[in-house]
From Swiss-Prot:
Protein location: Nucleus
Lineage: Eukaryota, Amoebozoa, Evosea, Eumycetozoa, Dictyostelia
Self-association and partners: Component of the Mediator complex.
Claim: Mitochondrion is one of the keywords in the record: no
Protein name per the record: Putative mediator of RNA polymerase II transcription subunit 30
Residue spans of biased composition, Basic and acidic residues class: 177-189
The gene coding this protein: med30
């Protein structure tokens, strides 16, 4: 009976250790999720945003030399229009209205073109450096979370090893029980008066053995669930590492 109680205490202590390790794993997973939420946006999407920003800068650089002759053309048009207005006012008064309208519209168009060019160039410059700085800090934080997860996984491995040792001990028990039964039968043949208490002790030992086997099955299920959680965590960390590598490549390209 003392051995059975000791084994039950060991199983209870292993169950407590397993629950603590699962709790640590869940806390680490929550920390990773919170860290991912603090990132500005999805790394895959930021890769697309950075390429679009580069395309906008290139298109603006191509449009900038074209905007200069447009202003010169507008100035030449205004000069020609002014010359035409002086000639037409001397001849007739009816033709002055279209020339004045064309002369007034040309500087407005030049102002609109300069305003559009200035508004396009403003949002492109501050977006690029903020992304690169944030992802460096995120990478360091995720490394720390990885180390915490590895420590919790090692603790789970220790509990699984202890469970396997208990299983081997319990599998060896039936052989010992058979030997004990043989000795008890011999004693029963010698002393028929003591047969009732020996049978009761055998039944108690069998019940204890069934309870221990049930506890082992429960611990196996807990270990299987932990293994599934660890596999999901490893897959998520691999995807996260791939996204960080892609962002590091884009950051070095933009720099």
């Amino acid at each position: 009976m003392d051995k059975i109680e000791i084994e039950e205490e060991l199983i209870c202590s292993l169950a407590v250790k397993g629950e603590k390790s699962i709790h640590k794993l869940l806390l680490n997973i929550l920390a990773i999720v919170k860290q991912l939420k603090t990132i500005q946006s999805d790394p895959v999407l930021t890769y697309q945003v950075s390429t679009k920003a580069q395309q906008q800068l290139q298109s603006q650089q191509l449009q900038q030399p074209q905007s200069i002759p447009s202003s010169t053309n507008n100035s030449t048009n205004t000069n020609t229009n002014n010359s035409t207005t002086t000639t037409t006012t001397s001849s007739t008064s009816s033709t002055t209205t279209p020339t004045t309208t064309t002369s007034t519209t040309s500087p407005l168009n030049s102002k609109d073109s300069t305003a559009t060019t200035t508004t396009k160039e403003q949002p492109s410059s501050p977006t690029l450096p903020t992304l690169n700085l944030n992802f460096v800090n995120d990478n360091d934080k995720i490394k720390e979370l990885n180390q915490n997860c590895i420590q919790s996984i090692l603790a789970l491995q220790k509990t699984i090893k202890e469970i396997s040792l208990l299983e081997t001990k319990i599998s060896q028990k039936p052989k010992d029980n058979i030997d004990n039964d043989d000795t008890i039968m011999k004693d029963d043949n010698n002393n028929s008066s003591t047969s009732a208490p020996t049978t009761t002790t055998i039944n108690i030992e069998k019940q204890d053995q069934t309870s221990l086997s049930n506890e082992l099955e429960r611990l196996k299920m807990d270990a299987y669930q932990k293994n599934c959680v660890i596999k999901k965590l490893i897959d998520n960390m691999r995807l996260l590492q791939l996204s960080i590598n892609s962002m590091n490549r884009t950051s070095t390209g933009t720099d």
